[in-house]
């Protein structure tokens, strides 16, 4: 049997067969070696801050802690995950809370632990200031333009809810509540190209020139591209750093002080580390289509249904036979949900697309590649389906880092309520 198609993971098809025989399908598998490799690729930046929303398992966070990667949290739940994953909020801004809205319970938590807040709205400044004057804050700025691999991942411009539109409106509140302004942050979307990157760097310089307070840090945000297609070019990290470092030097010279440069990636660090393994349960034909139905759906991996995202798919035969790449079929790959949109091979407009795959049999496994980011963290219980296991390949061993949710656990919040 051939190894995994597409690249990267250090484990083999035989390893996957052993895992599914023990834990069943569907399931997630991550390779820690790839995560560590991606961390090292960003070593030129002063601070790497992981966008936890992309993959929030506490054992993944423990791995980041080991390599001195800090955390960006966007909810109370993510703050709690960071706390249980060894991060200490009093230690050199280990955790920053980023949001455009802050609920009362979350506000109480960030005040309790003195967590710096990356503030994305003027109303938040007032709400935080009344409870915690003198708090350490960042300002998230909307540079009035954005870009992403999908309209839904564009986080800048007048159609985006994210960030402060006019930085000048923030200054009276900073003075009124004696906030300590640490830095400025910009993130215009997921999947940023170099043309837009240059605009962001210039926009950051312009915002600092407007700022009435001397900051210490600038954040490049995230958005580094990931090569989901086999022929995609990986992002040039050196060029990415060069552009931001150039902006940092201009800002440092203007403020006459050292400026720390942070980057806040999510997908870049974890996407390529993960796979989703599913079993083929049905192969059906219509006049013009062949449909392959697997036991995972958009309740597990929602990116194709939500964004039209592409994930490379490879085949692992259940019986260990060799894959014959000369004997192929053109098929639509779907999940089990009672939902027409539960299709893994569709574009951003919802148009059904086919994928050329080796001829498969019932019981074979499909592997969806590059699902380490926004896979498990965006999964749900839709159709009352339990959350699936997560497995981490670390130190040449496979470790279960989330067991399969039981039906009892799924129903527990509702039983005995009345």
Curated annotation (Swiss-Prot):
Lipid metabolism found in the keyword field: no
InterPro entries documented for this protein: Ala_racemase/Decarboxylase_C, DAP_deCOOHase_LysA, De-COase2_C, De-COase2_N, Orn/DAP/Arg_de-COase, PLP-binding_barrel
GO biological process terms held by the UniProt record: lysine biosynthetic process via diaminopimelate
Pathway(s) per entry: Amino-acid biosynthesis; L-lysine biosynthesis via DAP pathway; L-lysine from DL-2,6-diaminopimelate: step 1/1
Reaction catalysed by this enzyme: meso-2,6-diaminopimelate + H(+) = L-lysine + CO2
Binding-site positions, substrate: 267, 303, 307, 339, 374
Membrane-crossing segments per the record: none
Cofactors: pyridoxal 5'-phosphate
Listed EC numbers: 4.1.1.20
Quaternary structure (record): Homodimer.
Reported function: Specifically catalyzes the decarboxylation of meso-diaminopimelate (meso-DAP) to L-lysine.
NCBIfam families: lysA
The protein, known as: Diaminopimelate decarboxylase
Gene name of the encoded protein: lysA
